[in-house]
């Protein structure tokens, strides 16, 4: 094959990275970014992550509301006290319980110690397993809501299902194609939410645990299917930006949960002569997720199948010969060890830097820093959502790799030097200074995470693999990320409480150690990824063979 004839052979794209695509001879779509065509293509990556985000942000508000529903001490009217269903409460005169008291009629526990009446000193309070001492208020109170172990298992239950869904998502999507996949994702989500309604009505913890696992499976599955669908059918010049909508939708869903949590949880009338209806409020929080699941069931009406087609073939007029050649470029698991290890490192940066500790336990963290739990929660989630929208213009200016590494590295430093070291007891003298520095550190970390790490992860989870290996590769990458997520969700509340010295210890100690750990992991992972993280590029020899095959044989010119 002569040089002249080689130059006439069709040139193949070598990378899916933005910087490489600029020189690609593939025709780009003239479709404007804000168009009905792009909206239809992006609907799955908007709706299904919105459902995922809502349930990701569900743990904090739901747990806080359960704490309100099981805390008899909060209620100051007989009707609201005795109609509480999450705890056995009774209305009585305090003088019949203890002789030396300034309280009159109070709401206390019918089946265990009413700690705020019985104990006024720390030693007596800590001697009773039903009680805990508050160092901030210098009072004794009952253990209410979920324990640290229950909180961790509750937060982890969704992730258990999501991990299984993510690991199986590539295989299931390949077998079912897109329309049936979205249908089953919607139906399984509805089933999971119905079980959550049942668990809430019964106040049964283990039914809730099972319900969240069932719900987690389709939410993990959708993280593969929706990203792959958008990457497949989006125009080349909009694909990366549309891909970042996954994290934008997740953060929006988290904010929606915090909004409903604030509206439902902070409007309880503790002194009203009526039923506080805490169970109904918790059911209302679940019902939004149920409604979103029903919407997902109808996604097949606007989506289309085409799993076996090459990427963006419908938009860019790719011929069937090119498509079949790409589909035939199979890679073994051994050949993909490098990209898979890249995916593991990305999972470390995405989860082991502590984002879901902030998301799931934001009410507790903000309460420890002096804010009302649900108010602090919505502030965190609003900031989280606003920061995510910044990725849309940034993704059109910088590559996914640059955003991921820069934001991950700087965010990890914030964890150590703002969220960790200054919060450790004895380092900063003023409580107000501790709160101010820690909240600033958390805010900067969340902003950097949502402007780079989170949105770029789901794009890079596809881009680091060749096209034929993407369903399996992205499933492994997202599955590993969910495993790290599970570890954090279960271990964070247990570890921070243990490091702090138990339920009555100083929570700042455990929180500081956790954030220092998060930051160190993030810094190390980002340094490793700086040298190894690259979008997939076909090996030069393979590209040359493809070009030779596409050229006209010399004999046919003679």
Swiss-Prot record:
InterPro entries in the cross-refs: GLUT, MFS_dom, MFS_sugar_transport-like, MFS_trans_sf, Sugar/inositol_transpt
One GO CC annotation: membrane
Membrane topology qualifier: Multi-pass membrane protein
CDD domains: MFS_GLUT_like
Transmembrane segments: 39-59, 153-173, 180-200, 205-225, 242-262, 282-302, 336-356, 374-394, 403-423, 442-463, 479-499, 513-533
Chief location bin: membrane
Family, similarity comment: Belongs to the major facilitator superfamily. Sugar transporter (TC 2.A.1.1) family.
Regions of this protein lying in the Extracellular compartment: 60-152, 201-204, 263-281, 357-373, 424-441, 500-512
Subcellular localization(s) per the UniProt record: Membrane
Region feature Disordered, mapped onto this chain: 1-28
GO MF, one example: hexose transmembrane transporter activity
PANTHER family assigned to the protein according to its UniProt record, in alphabetical order: FACILITATED GLUCOSE TRANSPORTER PROTEIN 1, SOLUTE CARRIER FAMILY 2
UniProtKB keywords: Membrane, Sugar transport, Transmembrane, Transmembrane helix, Transport
Keyword Cell membrane tagged: no
PROSITE patterns attached to this UniProt entry: MFS (PS50850)
Topology, Cytoplasmic side: 1-38, 174-179, 226-241, 303-335, 395-402, 464-478, 534-558
Protein known as: Membrane transporter D2
């Amino acid at each position: 094959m002569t040089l002249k004839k080689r130059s006439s052979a069709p040139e193949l794209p070598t990378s899916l990275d933005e910087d490489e695509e600029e020189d690609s001879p593939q025709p780009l779509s003239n479709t404007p970014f804000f168009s009905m065509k792009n909206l239809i293509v992006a609907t799955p990556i908007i709706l299904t992550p919105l459902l995922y985000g809502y349930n990701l942000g569900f743990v904090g508000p739901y747990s806080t509301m359960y704490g309100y529903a099981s805390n008899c001490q909060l209620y100051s009217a007989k009707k609201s006290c005795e109609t509480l269903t999450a705890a056995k409460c009774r209305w009585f005169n305090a003088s019949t319980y203890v002789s030396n008291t300034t309280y009159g009629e109070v709401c206390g526990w019918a089946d265990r110690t009413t700690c705020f009446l019985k104990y006024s000193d720390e030693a007596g309070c800590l001697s009773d397993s039903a009680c805990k001492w508050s160092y901030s208020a210098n009072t004794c109170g009952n253990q209410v809501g979920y324990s640290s172990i229950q909180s961790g298992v509750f937060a982890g239950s969704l992730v258990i299902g999501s991990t299984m869904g993510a690991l199986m998502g590539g295989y299931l999507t390949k077998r079912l194609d897109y329309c049936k996949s979205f249908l089953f994702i919607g139906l399984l989500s509805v089933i999971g939410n119905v079980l959550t309604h049942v668990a809430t009505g019964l106040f049964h913890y283990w039914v809730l645990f099972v319900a969240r696992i069932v719900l987690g499976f389709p939410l993990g599955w959708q993280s593969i299917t929706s990203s792959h669908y958008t990457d497949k059918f989006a125009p080349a010049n909009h694909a990366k930006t549309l891909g970042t909508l996954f994290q934008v939708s997740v953060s929006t869903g988290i904010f929606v949960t915090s909004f409903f949590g604030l509206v439902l949880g902070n409007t309880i009338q503790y002194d009203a002569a009526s039923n506080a209806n805490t169970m109904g409020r918790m059911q209302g929080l679940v019902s939004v997720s149920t409604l979103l699941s029903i919407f997902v069931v109808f996604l097949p009406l606007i989506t289309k199948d085409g799993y076996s087609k090459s990427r963006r073939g419908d938009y860019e007029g790719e011929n069937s010969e090119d498509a079949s050649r790409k589909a035939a470029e199979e890679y073994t698991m051994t050949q993909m060890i490098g990209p898979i290890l890249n995916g593991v490192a990305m999972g470390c940066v995405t989860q082991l830097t502590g984002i879901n500790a902030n998301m799931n336990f934001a009410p507790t963290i903000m309460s420890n820093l002096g804010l009302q739990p649900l108010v602090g929660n919505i502030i965190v989630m609003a900031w989280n959502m606003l920061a995510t929208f910044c990725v849309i213009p940034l993704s059109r200016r910088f590559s996914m790799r640059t955003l991921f590494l820069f934001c991950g590295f700087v965010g990890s430093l914030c964890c150590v030097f703002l969220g960790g070291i200054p919060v450790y007891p004895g380092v900063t003298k003023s409580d107000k200074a501790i709160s101010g520095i820690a909240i600033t550190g958390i805010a900067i970390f969340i902003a950097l995470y949502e402007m780079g790490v989170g949105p770029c992860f789901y794009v890079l989870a596809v881009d680091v693999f060749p096209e034929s290996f993407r369903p399996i590769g992205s499933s492994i990458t997202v599955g590993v990320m969910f495993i790290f997520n599970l570890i954090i969700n279960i271990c964070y509340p247990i570890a921070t409480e243990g490091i702090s010295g138990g339920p009555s210890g100083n929570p700042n100690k455990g929180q500081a150690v956790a954030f220092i750990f998060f930051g160190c992991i993030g810094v190390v992972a980002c340094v490793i990824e700086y040298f190894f993280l690259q979008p997939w590029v076909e090996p030069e020899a393979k590209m040359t063979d493809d070009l030779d095959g596409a050229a006209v044989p010399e004999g046919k010119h003679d």
